[in-house]
Amino acid sequence: MGNKALPSICYDLHSHSSASDGVLSPTALVQLAAENGVDVLALTDHDCTDGHAEAVAAAAEAGIRFIPGIEISVSWHKRLIHVVGLGVDGNNSEMQQGLVDLRAKRTQRAEEIGAKFTKIGMPDVYEGACALADGVVSRSHFAMYLVQQGVVKDVQQAFKKYLQQGKRCYVGCEWASLEDALKWIHGAGGQAVVAHPARYKMSRTLFREFLIDFKVLGGVGIEVACSSHNLEEATQMAAYAQEMGLLASAGSDFHSPDNTWAKLGRVHPLPEGCQPIWKDWD
């Protein structure tokens, strides 16, 4: 896949803490990143920047560089897309107001998911998911509770059986528009990156249409290397990045040490020919 040697600097620019749907506190996340050899870490919690201050302090203690980030849920052509913002100012008022609105939607959706579980004879699932969440309840908290109770063997099975689109307890939502999400990220001084793009299973034509919209609105990057991409998908995303003039990012999308498919700092190197998102960082 191009560069076989490990890069001199290890970047992991997509991770989650207990401020959203990760299981580790921001401090524990940073400590694990340092143990795993990560040099530059971005915390990109879903629709939330609450973990930034704690992570900044932990990164200073651990001696690694911290990039304040965000992962925003976007609705585009009735599809859920995740957009990562890197280098955002968590105190930006316009972005924070947008995130407040998104978290309110998450809360409403969680209640509706809980009602669906009750309807199929599982009335304790909503309360259990709430107990696992430090903040807003997400589908991942429902999945973690189902694993905890032995209903499913792992988080992936919980999604496949109950929580993904088309399953019994799935609830759709109208998230932020692509235009709004990129406006918030840019207004907060950040760079907008398409998260785990191969996961969306779009046709080539539709994906190019999305990337055109994304770039026109100011998007600059695409996650080429991430835990959910195999080597073929990473190579394909690298080709899209070069075709569309987008920078390449790399991130594990880490949520939990128990998720063996998404280990913190364990990301394939970028394929040759990619321009990394960090190329102009100081």
Task: Name these PLM-found stretches.
Residues E94, N259-T260:
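A short acidic, helix-capping loop that chelates divalent metal ions and anchors anionic groups
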Residues G2, A58-I212, H268-Q275:
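Extended substrate/RNA-proximal surfaces in nucleic-acid metabolism proteins
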